[in-house]
Amino acid sequence: MRLYTEYIPNKNKLINQQQYHSDLQDLLHQWILQLLQLDVLPLSNRKYQSSRCHPKSVGEYLIVVRAIDALGNSQPLTSRRNQVSRAMTFVQNSLNEENLHPNID
């Protein structure tokens, strides 16, 4: 199962850069929690990891989520059975229509 997430801020409301990054972190956290709920078999001794994203500049960011088992083996980036979850995120510092990223409506 593949999950795609788009974050499009409200154009009618000016959001400062710090609030935008905070909202983006909340979205990423919710997206990762959504991935964790896709487990079919019960797992024991499960550890959850959290991470924060602080983009240093505007632009496109590809987020890749890989599973790591208890032995430290990580999910390969390409496989036939289970695809690595990816999401494209667009970061900009203003909601000015002139500088709007082409992939944001």
From Swiss-Prot:
Name under which the protein is recorded: Uncharacterized protein YrdK
Species of provenance: Bacillus subtilis (strain 168)
Gene responsible for this protein: yrdK
